[in-house]
Structure formats: structure tokens, C-alpha cells
């Protein structure tokens, strides 16, 4: 019985991780894009300040 419960739990974990992965990837991509945009903005501000 313990083995069966362990197998079912591991299977459920695998299924849940497979379902969650695309959403997690989208979130990571969005965070990465936002981070890049912020870095670009900071670089632009630094350049403008140096020019002034």
C-alpha cells in the first residue's frame, strides 16, 4: 500500500509540474524582458546625464 501511495504521489507531482511549467516559463520570460527594459532605461538615463 505504501508503495502504491508513493507511486501515485510521484505521478501527481509529475503531472502538476508538467502543467505548471509553461506558465512558469511565460512568467520567467516576462520577468527577463522587464529586467532588460529596466537595464536599457537605466543605461539611457546614465548616457543622458553624462551628456548633460
UniProtKB/Swiss-Prot annotation:
Xref: NCBIfam families: P_lamban (TIGR01294)
Transmembrane segments: 32-52
Entry membrane topology: Single-pass membrane protein
Residues carrying Phosphoserine: 16
Keyword annotations of the record: Acetylation, Endoplasmic reticulum, Membrane, Mitochondrion, Phosphoprotein, Sarcoplasmic reticulum, Transmembrane, Transmembrane helix
Pfam family membership, one: Phospholamban
Topology Cytoplasmic: residue spans: 1-31
Gene Ontology, cellular component aspect: membrane; mitochondrial membrane; sarcoplasmic reticulum; sarcoplasmic reticulum membrane
N-acetylmethionine: modified positions: 1
Subunit comment: Homopentamer.
Function: Reversibly inhibits the activity of ATP2A2/SERCA2 in cardiac sarcoplasmic reticulum by decreasing the apparent affinity of the ATPase for Ca(2+). Binds preferentially to the ATP-bound E1 conformational form of ATP2A2 which predominates at low Ca(2+) concentrations during the diastolic phase of the cardiac cycle. Inhibits ATP2A2 Ca(2+) affinity by disrupting its allosteric activation by ATP. Modulates the contractility of the heart muscle in response to physiological stimuli via its effects on ATP2A2.
Superkingdom, natural source: Eukaryota
Keyword Membrane set for record: yes
Tissue: Heart.
GO biological process, one term: locomotor rhythm
Gene Ontology MF annotations: ATPase inhibitor activity
Keyword Phosphoprotein appears in the UniProt entry: yes
PTM remark: Phosphorylated in response to beta-adrenergic stimulation. Phosphorylation by PKA abolishes the inhibition of ATP2A2-mediated calcium uptake.
Sequence positions bearing Phosphothreonine: 17
InterPro entries registered for this protein in UniProt: PLB (IPR005984)
Locations listed in the record: Endoplasmic reticulum membrane; Sarcoplasmic reticulum membrane; Mitochondrion membrane; Membrane
UniProt family annotation: Belongs to the phospholamban family.
Name the record gives this protein: Phospholamban
Amino acid at each position: 500500500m505504501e508503495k502504491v501511495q508513493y507511486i501515485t504521489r510521484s505521478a501527481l507531482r509529475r503531472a502538476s509540474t508538467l502543467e505548471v511549467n509553461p506558465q512558469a516559463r511565460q512568467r520567467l520570460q516576462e520577468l527577463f524582458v522587464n529586467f532588460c527594459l529596466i537595464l536599457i532605461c537605466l543605461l539611457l538615463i546614465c548616457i543622458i546625464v553624462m551628456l548633460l
